[in-house]
Regions:
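N-terminal helical cap/lid subdomain that shapes the substrate entry/recognition surface
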Residues: 19-134, 138-142, 155
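Asp-based, Mg2+/Mn2+-dependent phosphohydrolase catalytic module
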Residues: 1-37, 103, 130-137, 141-256
Length: 256
């Protein structure tokens, strides 16, 4: 478990802080048959080898692990603010605070972060996520990606050595759905329909959707009839009414 203290998914598919079953997303036998993934924050992160030196000029840490943590701090702040997909103000401020930018420079650093974090920068492959995808592929688990993106995500995932749509050098996804390409974005449940068409043999309630946003991913997956799982490696959502994991490596125990 990454970032200790995160409540992992029990083998019956439910998050059990304090021993209590949570949420409306239960499946009676707790076994799932396929997985859909968000891309940003789940498979790749904004490249810390770029953002580290950038924010170090404002007193921030350049350590990769600190920037990994900062992304999830930013996403938690974004979710608390119920911010839309296009509103990254709360994320930017939480990010620069998390990497310990000098307090009197945080507003300008957040603005610079906002102008630097382009779609193409979401390219740093999360090592344990890559390992998890390979393990799931070896088991024959059907997988796809559903991402709010800008037309670039299929190329980025392939170029970063994470996965590709169909057979190839890396892990095969049945489809990589990019919101810019299909014209609909999370939390609109219609975006998941493009992936579900590629998983016709599986009841949607037995498909996991793993994301890093409460507003976009958990809400969108629920509306589409999928079982949402939040990647929450630093226990930023202790009062969640949905399932959480600290790493994609924890998915193995949920799949039949």
């Amino acid at each position: 478990m990454v970032g200790g203290g995160v409540v992992t998914l029990a083998v019956d598919g439910r998050n059990r802080p304090g021993g209590a079953s949570q949420g409306p997303d239960d499946v009676s036998d707790g076994r799932f048959e396929a997985v859909l993934f968000d891309a940003g924050g789940v498979l790749v992160l904004p490249d810390p080898t770029v953002l580290g030196p950038l924010l170090a000029a404002y007193g921030g840490s350049a350590e990769i692990d600190d920037h990994r943590r900062a992304h999830y701090a930013g996403m938690a702040a974004k979710s608390r603010a119920a911010a839309s997909e296009s509103d990254w103000d709360s994320y930017n401020l939480a990010y620069v605070e998390s990497v310990d930018v000098d307090p009197d420079l945080r507003l300008i650093a957040a603005s610079i972060l906002d102008h630097t974090r382009s779609a193409a920068l979401w390219r740093w492959a999360i090592p344990e996520s890559v390992r998890a995808l390979r393990a799931l592929e070896e088991r024959g688990v059907p997988m796809s990606v559903v991402s709010n993106a800008s037309g670039q995500i299929a190329w980025v995932l392939s170029h970063s050595g994470v996965c590709q749509e169909g057979p190839g050098e890396d892990v095969a996804m049945r489809i990589v759905v990019d919101s810019h390409v299909v014209g609909v974005a999370k939390p609109d449940p219609r975006i998941f329909g493009f992936a579900l068409e590629m998983h016709p043999e599986t009841d949607p309630k037995r498909i996991l959707y793993v994301g890093d946003s409460v507003v976009m991913d958990v809400a969108g997956a629920r509306a589409a009839g999928l079982h949402p799982v939040l990647l929450d490696p630093f226990d930023d959502h202790p009062d969640a009414d949905f399932d959480r994991i600290g790493s994609l490596l924890e998915l193995d125990g949920l799949l039949g």
